[in-house]
Amino acid sequence: MDSVPRDYSKRVYQGVRVKHTVKDLLAEKRSRQTSNTRLNGSVSSSQPPFIQMPGSPVMSGYYGVRRSFLSDSDFHSSKQFSNDLYTSGMSKPFACESTAGQSHTGLLESYLAEPYGDYRPPALTPTPSSLFSTSTLPPLLPPPFPSDPTHFVFRDSWEQTVPDGLSQPDPMPADALQSLPPSTSCLSQLESGSSTQHRNMGWGASLAGAQSYSLHALEDLHHTPGYPTSPPYPFTSFMTVSNDLPPKVGPLSPEEGSDVSSLHDPSPWTKEDGSMAWGSYECRRAY
């Protein structure tokens, strides 16, 4: 009982505002009355929750007033209820979590086992003929080793035409070159060569062999003795050759004639680095 007057004197001494000090005094009286009437010998245990903190006398006094209305029996009963709630709640969620975790894992395993365990392995384990016979997959080359049928080489859509272009070049320029009479102009042949170059330059650097073959054929045609130095340019040669460049019908100017005469020199075709590009650009400039 000695601690109560000390707290009382402290609160009176620390109180700055009269309203809060009166409320604190009333709260102390009520708390002492309730503690004396309902509890015997537990005053020291019931008093610490209502001790005012010295740092903030006003607010702690206000909260002390609010807390002093709760009786100790209610406080202990709520404490006990909270303990029961925590113990029962903690024991039940653990059990629920264990059962829920098992049920969730079981459900997930059942759901995952159906699409991934039952349906996908049959799709991956049939024979290669039934698996790769779908139209969405690219066609397969024959296995490189006849004794080992498991080596399959995939072939992309853009790779299908590259070996064909290497093994079998475009027959149209060769037929046109063979079918042309000896009186046709060199410009038409160069033009057909430029068209083949324009077609072959799209394949990339892997087709340098095919381009070099067409160039060698043009060089051989240049050195044939049956070509006139300044022949007339008939319009039938432009119609018979299938080329990508549009034909220009009309007389040639002297500048264009000089450019065309420079085409007879095989020096641009023997360049090592830019022979493809120089030949195609000179043919276009001649046009």
Swiss-Prot record:
Places the protein is found: Cytoplasm, Cytosol; Nucleus
The keyword Lipid metabolism is assigned to this record: no
Classification via InterPro entries: OCA, POU2AF2
Tissue specificity: Expressed in tuft cells of the small intestine, trachea, thymus, and colon.
Superkingdom assignment: Eukaryota
Statement: the UniProt record of this protein carries the keyword Transcription regulation: yes
GO cellular component, one term: nucleus
Keywords, comma-separated and alphabetical: Activator, Cytoplasm, Nucleus, Transcription, Transcription regulation
UniProt biased composition (Polar residues): 33-49, 180-199
Observed phenotype of the null mutant: Mutant mice generated by CRISPR-Cas9-mediated gene editing are born at normal Mendelian ratios, and have indistinguishable weight, morphology, fertility, and organ histology from normal mice. However, tuft cells in the trachea, small intestine, urethra, gall bladder, tongue, and nasal epithelium are indetectable in Pou2af2-/- mice, whereas a partial loss of tuft cells is observed in the colon.
Pfam families: POU2AF2 (PF17721)
UniProt family annotation: Belongs to the POU2AF family.
Domain notes: In the N-terminus possesses a conserved OCA domain for bivalent binding to class II POU domain-containing transcription factors and to an octamer DNA motif (5'-ATGAAAT-3').
Protein function: Transcriptional coactivator of POU2F3. This complex drives the development of tuft cells, a rare chemosensory cells that coordinate immune and neural functions within mucosal epithelial tissues.
Protein name, UniProt field: POU domain class 2-associating factor 2
